Amino acid sequence: MTIAEIRKHAATRMDQSIAAFRNNLQKIRTGRANPALLDAVQVDYYGALVPLSQVANVALIDARTISVQPWEKGMGAKIEKAIRDSDLGLNPAAMGDLIRVPMPPMSQERRKEMTKLARNEGESAKIAVRNLRRDANESIKKLVKDKLASEDEQKRAETEVQKFTDKHIAEIDALVAAKEQEIMAL
């Protein structure tokens, strides 16, 4: 592996870490309804647990209500039970074939818990980015040790990897701040 390949690999992996972090942030509940909130709900489908999105259509009705439309008529009760049993604190209501999931207003205490969760996710993402930096720097040092690169190239490459790291950590901080603001907004 050359230094250029190591840098490219590190940048790609850091981008993937940011994408995974964004995905995790979407699952954190805010005051508004978000269909991604129900992604983690598992439904019993003929003896197997499957994600809700594989047995129903999940959409927004308005800013505070999610609709769940089962693809099979008999699945309504199971979907309703799965949503109620999830640790999201939601209370679905069946209206014929359609299940409405109103988002209850969050208490101040719950909002603080959610911001803490967002910060913890941010810290985990930063740790992942820093670990990728460490791995890249170790690979670069190995090239120098094996005499496949000079020490000047090592310094340049490490500086570039550090710039990638700083950029990605700043992006994580910005995403966490935006999520905190979204959670605390009434």
Curated annotation (Swiss-Prot):
GO terms for cellular component: cytosol. Its main location: cytoplasm. SUPFAM superfamilies: Ribosome recycling factor, RRF. GO terms for biological process: cytoplasmic translational termination. Coiled coil: none annotated. Responsible for the release of ribosomes from messenger RNA at the termination of protein biosynthesis. May increase the efficiency of translation by recycling ribosomes from one round of translation to another. This is Ribosome-recycling factor. The lineage of its organism: Bacteria, Pseudomonadati, Pseudomonadota, Betaproteobacteria, Burkholderiales. The gene is frr.
